[in-house]
Amino acid sequence: MTEIAIPNGVETLGNYAFYGCSALATVTLGTQERSSSSLKTIGDYAFAETAVKSVVLPNGVSTLGNYAFNKCASLATVSLGNSLTAIGDYAFSDCKKLESVTFGSALETIGERAFASAKISSLVLPAAVRTIGDWAFYNNPLTAITFNDGLQSIGSRAFYGVSVQTLNIPNSVTELGSYAFSGCKSLETVTIGTGVTKISDYAFNTCSALTQISCPSVTEIGASAFKGCSSLTDIPLNDKITSLGNYVFSGCSAIESLVIPNSVTSIGSYAFEKCTKLTSATLGTGISSIPDYMFSSCSALTSVVLPENITGIGKYAFQSTAFTELPLTASITEIKDYAFKSCTKLTSVAIPDRVTKLGTYVFQSCTGLESAKIGGGVTSVPNYMFHGCTNLVNVELSEKVTSIGNSAFYNCKGLKSLPVTESITSIGTNAFYGCTSLTSVHLSDQVTSLGASVFYGCSSLTEAVLGTGITTLGSSLFRNDAKLKKVVANGKIASVSTYTFNGCSSLERIYINNTPPTGASSNTFTKVPTSCRIYAPAQTCQFYAQTTYWKDFVIMPWLDELEIVSTTPSMSFDGGEALDVKPDTKTFVIEFNRTVVNTDSVSAMLIRSGFPVEDQVLTVSYSGNEVTVIREGKDLPNDPYYYLVLTTSDKQFSILFKVTTVTGIDEPVVEKEVRLREYYSVDGKLLPRPVQGINIVKTVYEDGSIEVSKVYVKPEDCRR
C-alpha cells in the first residue's frame, strides 16, 4: 500500500492503524476542506515508521497521539490544523527530513521529544502555546526561534544542541528546564525575562560562543548552568543572586575578573574551576568558607579578596593558581586537602597559629616554594603536606608540632637540614624520601616512632644519629643512601627490617646499642661493604660475631667519643688563649674521658706558626685514659703559636701553647721582601689558595732566593 485517503465521517484513527506500512507515502486525512472534516483523533503510532512525505491535519483534529508519525524518514512538511491543542510525545521524533512545520492557533502543548532530531531551521510559536516538553526540539538545526508571550515552561533539553544565535525568553516563562539550551554552540546572546528566577542545571552548558546574558530576576543559578561557556566574559551576577551551583561557571576561560555579591550565600564545588584567564576575584560576605575546587586550575589567578568572615578553605580550592602569597584572613582556621596544590609561584608560606586544621597534600608540588613556617595551631605536619616541593630549603616548625606525617617532605630535593624540633615524637613513612640535599640527620631522644623509608634516597646523607627513643629501624630506612658513612642508633634497637641499609655502598660504621637486633635478611645490607664496622656494647660483640648477616662485618666494641679532660703541662684545648710551655719540655700527657684503645689510632704532629716542625720527632704511647707524647729534638724556640695536633680514627684535637724565654738575646731577623708565593698539595698540584691540612709553600724573594716549606692549615683558618 502506497497511498490512502481517510474518508469524511471517520472520527478516530486507532492506535497503530498504519504502523510500519513502510511503502505508504501519501495520506489524505478526511475531506480536502479542512473546515468540514469529521476526523478528531489520531491514535498512538498511527502512522509511525511509514514513508509518508507530507502531513496536513484538518481543523477538526484535536488530538495527536504519542509516536503518531515517529520515524517517518521521508516526512518533509507538516501542517497542523487550528483545532489541535497538544502534540503527543515523540509525535514527529526522528523524522530526519522534516524541515517545515506550521502550527495551528489552538496549540497549547508540545509533547516530549515531539520533534527531536528533525531538521527544522526556523520556529515561530503561536500565542496559545504554554508548554514545550522535554527534548521537544532536541538537536534540530534551528537558527531562529520566536517564543510567544504566553509561554510558561521550557522543558529539559527542549532545545539542546540547536544552532540559534540569539534568544529572547519572554517574561511569561517561569520554568527553564535543565539542559534546555545546552550544547548550543552558536548561541551568542541570551535575554531571560523577569519570570525566571532559577536557571536550571546545565541550562546553557557548553554554549561555547555565548558572550552576553541578561537575567535580571534570577536568584539561583544551577549546577553547570554555564559550564564550558568559553567565550563568556561577563558573569550575570546581580545583588539578587543567592545561590550558585556546582560547576556553575567551570571552564569559562574568557572571564578575567569576578565580583561575587554579598547576597550569595551558597556556592557549590568547582564553581569557577578552569577559568584560565581569571586574574582577580572578590568574594562577598554571604559565604563563610571557600568551597572545594572553587578556583582549581585558574592558572592566571593572582589575587583573591576574601571577606573577614571566611573561616575555611576547601579541598583543591586554589589548586594550580598563580598566587605568590597565601590569601589568608584573620578568621581562617581550616585549610583542607590539596588547597594550594601545584601553586608553583608561591615562594614562601606561613601558616598562622589561628589555623587549627590542616589537610593532606596542602602544598603538594609547589615547586617554587623555598621557605615554610607552620604555626602553633596544629600538632602535626600532615601527610604529603610538602610532597614534591623540590626547591623547599627552609622549614620552621612550632614547638607545638609533635609529629611529621607520611611523605610530608617527599622529594623536597632542596631541603638541607632536618626540620625536627625537640617536640617531635613521631616521623611517618617516607617523610623525607628523596631529600637529596640532606647531609646529616640528628634526632632527639624524644622521637619514639620512625616509619619505613623515612630517609630512602637521601643521596647526600653522610651521617645519621638517632636518639634513645628509637627502638626499631624500619624497612628501607636508609635505602640507596650511597654516601652514608655513619649511623648511630643510641636506643635499644630490637629489630631491623628488609632493605634498612640496602644500597648504602659507602657505609663505614654502624653503632647499635643492644644485642643483635632481629629481622635482618639478605636484603638488609645489600651493597654495604664488608669493611663496615659494627660497634656494639662490648659484652655483645661475641653474639654479633655469631649472628647471620651481622657476622659478615667487622665487629667492634662501642666506646664513648674521645674528649680531652686535661693536659700536662697545662695547654689550651678548648679554644682559650695559648699557655706558656717551657722550651725544653719533652713530655706531654693528655688525659681523655675514657680508656684509649688500639682502634682509636692516635697520632701526633707539632705545628709552629702554621708549619710542621721538622727537626722534632714525636713518639705516642697510651695507657688507660692517658696519651703520652715524647718529643725528641732541640729546645723549642720562642713562638706564640704552637699546636700539638692529635689525630684519632674519629676526630682531630688541636692543643695550643706558646714558648717564650725571659733571658737571652735573640739575633735580629732581617725580613726579606717576597716577590711570589705559591701553594701546592702534597702530591704536587698547584692550589689557588691554602687548603685544610698540609700544604707545600714555595716562596720566591726579591733577591732571587727560593724557599720551600710545609704549612699546616687548620679548618678555621680555611674559613677565614
Predicted region positions:
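Surface-exposed, short loops/turns at beta-strand junctions within beta-sandwich domains
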Residues: 631-640, 689-691
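C-terminal tail/sorting-segment detector
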Residues: 696-720
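Consensus positions within tandem repeat domains that build extended binding/scaffold surfaces
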Residues: 14-19, 43-46, 65-70, 88-93, ...
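Structural signature of tandem-repeat unit edges
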Residues: 1-12, 22-41, 50-63, 73-86, ...
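Solvent-exposed, low-complexity, repeat-rich "mucin-like" stalks and linkers
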Residues: 562-603
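Residue-level detector of functionally pivotal "anchor" positions at catalytic/ligand-binding pockets or at interdomain
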Residues: 559-572, 660-686, 718-719
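Low-complexity "stalk/linker" and mucin-like segments enriched in Ser/Thr/Pro/Ala/Gly
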Residues: 573-579, 608-624
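C-terminal edge beta-strand
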Residues: 653-661, 709-711
